[in-house]
């Protein structure tokens, strides 16, 4: 008997801006072109998944995966306010149908960090207007594609802006106290965020931002978020869920959250409790009616009396400079399940490494933890590895290799499947 039973989803995840290429109407694309850009390099063609999705889906199917989580790019669907592009809807319809033809269940994310440039020019994610903008986009997509989708994530990592805000606040406190400029553990998890560069470019690029975004401080989804902005994101989620329920009541809908394995050290118990409250617990009133929650975890965060404790000496680090700690996933699932009682999906979990044997070991240990949770009757229904492809890792560009498939961007985007894809596939109970 395998690790998981029939009906459990084993898949991989991508995000449109990171893999498709030429997302020219998005805020991220605009930021990449700035003189004082927060991005190490521009995304350009990314890994051309937009034109090669059939090939990439075929690789997943051949490996034995039974699900694929991907995002629909809002900036492609609605490049100008109120002007929806039918050909782009048809593109995503083709992606969905390709998944089904190859035996993969499509899990569709409606917003994965990038937004249309016009949304940011109109106030972005700190403006209440974005709730209605997002709702109109969601309604359009669901009316067109909803009959072909069973699982929808409204917003990816809805808590990311608040996490970035916390990072910025900690950094400022360190500077004020003449502290070391050493990167804090967990600071760059997933987004590849360089908070120092973000702050510097906000200062230097104000005039450029005024020209491009109509404001000196554009409020993208991945900007440092205020509590009011956090509330706006959650109201946008709730309105989207309402729309989807009205159109397709049987569709399973939820969002995803970025969650650290927060471990209190002696004297840090109250701080750790406050961190978990900010990162997870305060979202419960907004998601308690959702049919599932997407859990996204990459490592742990140890909290002492004075805040985050450095990574243990001699600990293995990933390319992202955080601790290799696959056990974190099980700990997070168990913590979440005590407070959220719906279905859980691991919608992202993985590492950036050039050593695929370490990736395989990571997947093995992490999925052992998932299986242990299921054995204790925690309703975990799927595991999605981040990411399918070595891709554009936001501020860090193409230097971080998370993928199950290598992409040679200098040689015609040639794909090379890594052994880790086959390893993940053999975990699928349907194989």
In which residue ranges do the predicted regions lie?
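Non-catalytic scaffold segments within catalytic domains of secreted glycoside hydrolases
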Residues: 1-52, 57, 61-66, 77-431
């Amino acid at each position: 008997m395998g690790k998981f039973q029939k009906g459990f989803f084993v898949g991989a995840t991508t995000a449109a801006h990171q893999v498709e290429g030429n997302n020219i109407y998005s805020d991220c694309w605009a930021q990449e072109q700035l003189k004082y850009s927060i991005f190490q390099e521009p995304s350009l063609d990314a890994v051309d998944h937009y034109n090669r999705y059939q090939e990439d889906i075929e690789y997943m199917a051949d490996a034995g995966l039974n699900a694929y989580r991907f995002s629909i790019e809002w900036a492609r669907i609605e490049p100008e306010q109120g002007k929806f592009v039918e050909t782009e809807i048809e593109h995503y319809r083709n992606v969905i149908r390709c998944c089904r033809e190859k035996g993969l269940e499509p899990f569709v994310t409606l917003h994965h960090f990038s937004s249309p440039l016009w949304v940011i020019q109109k106030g972005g994610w700190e403006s209440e207007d974005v709730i209605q903008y997002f709702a109109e986009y969601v309604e359009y997509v669901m009316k067109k594609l909803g009959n072909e989708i069973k699982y929808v994530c409204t917003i990816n990592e809805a808590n990311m802006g608040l996490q970035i805000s916390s990072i910025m606040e900690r950094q400022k406190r360190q500077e004020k106290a003449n502290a070391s400029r050493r990167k804090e553990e967990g600071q760059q998890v997933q987004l590849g965020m360089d908070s120092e560069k973000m702050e510097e470019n906000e200062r230097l690029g104000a005039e450029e931002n005024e020209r491009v975004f109509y404001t000196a401080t554009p409020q993208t989804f991945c900007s440092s978020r205020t509590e009011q902005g956090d509330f706006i994101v959650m109201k946008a989620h709730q309105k989207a869920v309402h729309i989807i329920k009205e159109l397709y009541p049987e569709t399973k809908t939820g969002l995803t959250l970025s969650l650290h394995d927060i471990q209190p050290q002696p004297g840090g118990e109250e701080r750790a409790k406050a961190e978990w409250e900010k990162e997870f617990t305060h979202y419960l009133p907004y998601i308690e009616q959702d049919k599932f929650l997407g859990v996204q975890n990459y490592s742990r965060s140890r909290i002492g009396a004075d805040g985050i404790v450095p990574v243990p000496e001699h600990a293995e680090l990933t390319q992202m400079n955080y601790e290799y700690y696959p056990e974190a996933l099980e700990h997070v699932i168990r913590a979440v399940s005590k407070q959220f009682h719906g279905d859980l999906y691991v919608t992202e979990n993985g590492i950036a490494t050039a050593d695929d044997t370490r990736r395989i070991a990571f997947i093995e240990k992490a999925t052992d933890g998932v299986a242990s949770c299921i054995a204790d009757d925690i309703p975990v229904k799927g595991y999605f590895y981040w990411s399918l492809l070595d891709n554009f890792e936001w501020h860090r560009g193409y230097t971080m290799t998370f993928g199950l498939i290598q992409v040679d961007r200098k040689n015609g985007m040639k794909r090379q499947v890594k052994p880790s894809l086959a390893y993940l596939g053999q975990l699928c109970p349907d194989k």
